[in-house]
Amino acid sequence: MGYFLKLYAYVNSHSLFVWVCDRSYKRSFRPMILNKIKELSRNQFSTMSHLRKDSQPSSPGDDAMDRSGLPDLQGRFELSGKNRQYPLDALEPQPSIGDIKDIKKAAKSMLDPAHKSHFHPVTPSLVFLCFIFDGLHQALLSVGVSKRSNTVVGNENEERGTPYASRFKDMPNFIALEKSSVLRHCCDLLIGIAAGSSDKICTSSLQVQRRFKAMMASIGRLSHGESADLLISCNAESAIGWISSRPWVGELMFTLLFGDFESPLHKLRKSS
């Protein structure tokens, strides 16, 4: 009994649950645990062998067990290898961008916190980027970002091909403050990605606010530097981490840094 208690304590110290469920973890620790079993077995069976020598001759089977240093435990734990599976409603949301023809509706919908909460936390940021930068939607699809996503409504999952709210039957209009709020979120997001792990610039930090205010002043929306806060509760950190981990992040940032983009006031200036 002492042998099994020692073995249990040793294995449990390495998190038995993770060891069983994570195959890569299990493979890496298997030699260590096997060696520990052998070590404990040697200690136990050397003591037993000493007692047998004092009492009776050992049998060939006992000698074989002592030579291997590992008791024959095979067959005592005959497990099928199967595991209880998750139910069908366990699908997690994933980042998605919907269809290009609906991107304006999707961006307008993501301004609503209640609607946004049903989707993966990265989805609103991707939708806002696609709304701001023409051509980005197709580029994201080409690198594997999905159109469709599982949403969580109540305790049930449903698959959606579009992230916009059903109430928008017609194309919605954006007011200036909404557009500036989307720009602010994208500013937080892109500065966070560009800063990277070597320079911890937090989103909505003083450094980001200064740059955003300067941008708003340059396009004639000075007051929006303070008041464009409709998405202040929509933290970009999830999207920063997710995009930064993608293999295409370098190409995205290179394109944004060296691309030539028109001013957000281009249409207003042409009409005046």
Curated annotation (Swiss-Prot):
Q: Which organism is it from?
A: Homo sapiens (Human)
Q: Which Gene3D superfamilies does this entry report, sorted A to Z?
A: borna disease virus nucleoprotein, domain 1
Biological role stated in the UniProt entry:
May act as an RNA-binding protein. The C-terminal region is highly homologous to the bornavirus nucleocapsid N protein that binds viral RNA and oligomerizes. The viral protein also possesses a nuclear import and a nuclear export signal. These 2 signals seem absent in EBLN-2 supporting an unrelated function in Human.
SUPFAM superfamilies according to UniProt? P40 nucleoprotein
Give positions of region: Disordered. Answer: 48-70
Q: Which domain of life is it from?
A: Eukaryota
Under what name is this protein listed?
Answer: Endogenous Bornavirus-like nucleoprotein 2
The miscellaneous remark of the record is: Bornavirus is a non-retroviral RNA virus that does not generate DNA forms during viral replication. Therefore, integration of EBLN-2 must have occur through a mechanism relying on an endogenous reverse transcriptase activity.
InterPro entries tied to this protein: P40_nucleoprot_BD-vir, P40_nucleoprot_sf_BD-vir, P40_nucleoprot_sub1_BD-vir
